[in-house]
Amino acid sequence: MFHLYLLLVFETRYTCLMKCSISTCSYRWLRRREWFCLIYSGCCRKILVIEGLQRSDVAFLFTRRTIMHYVPFRGLFCASCVGYFSIRCCSRCEHFCTKTPTKSFGTEAWS
């Protein structure tokens, strides 16, 4: 039973990442352990940032796990690609995860 649980958790995370890899956004993939799902949008991305925010704002929003409480979400956003918040804009996020993490920003703990 325990092994089955581990398999289900792995499969959920893998499916989530694969769905994002075929999304309309195009940017280089980094280490998988740095990816997570936003709680409110359910969208898999590495460091999601809204255009115009400062680095400190992004860090604050993600540590609080309430980015949608602070930033209006209309389906348009920018995703960080390589380096320290270098921004590439995406048109939409059309693929979603089935689960959300228990913690945000660089964890693999799934609820």
From Swiss-Prot:
Sequence similarity: Belongs to the RxLR effector family.
Stretch forming the signal peptide: 1-17
Q: Keywords of this protein's UniProt record, alphabetized?
A: Host nucleus, Secreted, Signal, Virulence
Any idea what this protein is called?
Answer: Secreted RxLR effector protein 82
Could you name the Gene Ontology cellular component terms for this entry? extracellular region; host cell nucleus
| Gene designation per UniProt | RXLR82
Where's it found, cell-wise?
Answer: Secreted; Host nucleus
User: What free text does the record give on domains?
Assistant: Has the canonical translocation RxLR motif, but lacks the canonical EER motif, which characterizes most oomycete effectors identified so far.
Species of origin reads Plasmopara viticola
